[in-house]
Amino acid sequence: MKIAVDGMGGDFAPKEVVAGCVDALNENKDLHIVITGKEELIKKELEGHNYDEDRIEVLDAREVISTNDSPVMAIRRKKDSSLNKGLQLVKEKKVEGIISAGSTGAFMAGSLFIVGRIKGIDRPALAPIMPGKNAPFMVIDVGANAECKPQNLLQFALMGKIYFEKILNVKNPTIGLVNIGVEEEKGTELTKEAYKLLKNSGLNFIGNVEPRDIPTGDVNILVCDGFTGNTILKTYEGVAQNIFEILKAEIMSSFQGKIGGALLKPSFKNIKKKFNYKEYGGAAFIGVEGICVKAHGSSDRKAFKNAIKQCINFHKGNIINNIKEELVNIETLH
């Protein structure tokens, strides 16, 4: 498998990007990587690593898209950017997929304009796997589509189901619709109409799910518009971070707390690992004609390595072709 990695995207590029690529390369003997970005900077970072030189290429790109750039304008104007060049490789089928920790807006815009949508999918969606109390779960969409139609939510559910089955090996995953109550008649016109479509779709739809029940992980896939999903994602991240900080402050506030903290240190480490985004790689942008994974902006080498692993699993699961086949089978999507 061959993938492109945006060497200039993210808070710690290119150092952590390159390190993550090397780690992934050394763990996967059939993997080839093209790192796009400023050639001299990337090659300088590569000098400190041991790797198979035949399996890493550097594609020079002189421009960088920043988070301050207008996403659409940057994709149109910065043709020589590391992100643009990587996306072009996907479009030309020279690589199977791309990973970037750069601007989310530019990544999604570029994936749409350059790589293109799967025929029959109206709107691709951003879908991270998130840690839950009992099991990991997916939220789809978390920001690609602030406003949606009921049919969009049905397509999100379909794409999420295929992705979840292949990546987490869960057969016929449960699907819930994020809403303010569990009753069928609750919610906006969007959720009411989406409920009807999901109920009759043949998917394993279990009904509405209230936000307070999301963190359990008892429902595999949570479907919502991108505005709602982004709010869930950022609230989840913020609450988790604050809980760890509060726990740390309480433990350090007394002698007894320090003793208790020392005894519970292994448990705290396990919990922290479970809620660490680095363990999950990135969010897949599902519904485009290529594997597009958006890594967290502050990704380190471990996060990049896991994002690459995610790409590999996406490829092995043949997810794009599976989505195309499922579109033919479900008449309500047409």
Curated annotation (Swiss-Prot):
Check the record and name the SUPFAM superfamilies matching this protein: Isocitrate/Isopropylmalate dehydrogenase-like
Top-tier EC class? transferase
List, alphabetically, the InterPro entries matched.
FA_synthesis, Phospholipid_synth_PlsX-like
Entry's EC annotation: 2.3.1.274
Q: Which reaction does this chain catalyze?
A: a fatty acyl-[ACP] + phosphate = an acyl phosphate + holo-[ACP]
User: Where is it chiefly localized?
Assistant: cytoplasm
One GO location term (cellular component): cytoplasm
Gene Ontology biological process: fatty acid biosynthetic process; phospholipid biosynthetic process
GO MF terms, alphabetically ordered: phosphate:acyl-[acyl carrier protein] acyltransferase activity
SS bond partners: none
What is this protein's function?
A: Catalyzes the reversible formation of acyl-phosphate (acyl-PO(4)) from acyl-[acyl-carrier-protein] (acyl-ACP). This enzyme utilizes acyl-ACP as fatty acyl donor, but not acyl-CoA.
Instruction: Please state what the protein is called.
Output: Phosphate acyltransferase
| Annotated source species | Clostridium tetani (strain Massachusetts / E88)
